[in-house]
Amino acid sequence: MKITIFGAGAIGGYLAAKLAVAGRTELSIVARGAHLDAIKADGLRLIEDGQELLAPVRAAAKAEELGAQDYVVLALKAHSLTPALDQITPLLGQDTAVVTMQNGVPWWYFHEVGGPLEGTRLNAVDPGGKIWERIGPERVIGSVVYPAVEVDAPGLIRHVEGKRFSLGEPSGERSERVTQLAEEMVKAGLQVPVRDDIRSEIWVKLWGNLSFNPISALTGSTLAAIVADDGTRTLARTMMLEAQAIGESLGVRFPIAVDRRIKGAGDVGEHKTSMLQDLERGRPMEIDALVTAVQELGRLTDKPTPTIDAVLTLVRRLAVERGCYS
């Protein structure tokens, strides 16, 4: 089984290291810069459970060096997909499956979903439909990623907590390709449930991200602080209820109540969201996949999003001023 991880940052590097150490697959990564140089020189190192492991991976700067794969795991952020298309497509053979590990609403959302929106392309995450055309939604295996992982230094990945990667076909089918990949990941020591409704699980994670991420970026607050404050907690709750109405109109099942989801966020403690961390470090922010796409879904389903609209306007303006959004 030939697998390439495209984007070997924290999550991509962790998955690559786990699969490589298990030694059951022909594992390659596409990386760049100091990270790539370190991996080529010293291998990919993983710190997990107090131990440092050396993962034997093939690292390349260009996908052309690797050729067609059985599986390509896209572990880069959503806003990086379109610029990377020329690099990704050389990895795609006739039967290559593509595992999408981006946060937020996926570009393939309306593939094999049925109903009047079948085949709709979301401009917020796939401007001009380029990803849809060049990768093809028929290749996709959806996923929801839960591990907390850090890049401590170039070539050095540190696992913090969590080992679950949920997988699911857009159609809900338990196909041979998703089953085989899940089995390999489980043998590598990961928890990999195969879902018959991956969209609902995507929404439950998105539910918190679309609210807490922009609020944290706007206020500089941690999750615990946002939940402890009556004003910001109410703001997050209102955004979540607007999103829930959209999701339910699309057939999504929310297995927990909104207040329980908010409490869970607060219980995480003094944690800065990824969007706040990106803002502080001057990096591109995941605004479109986490917030703009939900607004677009609201327009498609005729569900009002006044609070989401207002927060989106503010966080987008802030990001532009800081050079974190264009």
Where are these predicted regions, by residue range?
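NAD(P)-dependent Rossmann-like dehydrogenase/reductase catalytic/cofactor-binding core
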Residues: 26, 225, 233-326
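Helix-loop-beta segment of a Rossmann-like dinucleotide-binding subdomain
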Residues: 92, 106-118, 157-169, 220-225, ...
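NAD(P)+-binding Rossmann beta1-loop-alpha1 motif at the extreme N-terminus of oxidoreductases
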Residues: 1-52
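Short internal beta-strands
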Residues: 29-31, 167, 295
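Internal alpha-helical scaffold of NAD(P)-dependent oxidoreductase catalytic cores
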Residues: 38, 91, 126, 132-205, ...
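Rossmann-like NAD(P)(H) cofactor-binding subdomain of soluble oxidoreductases
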Residues: 53-152
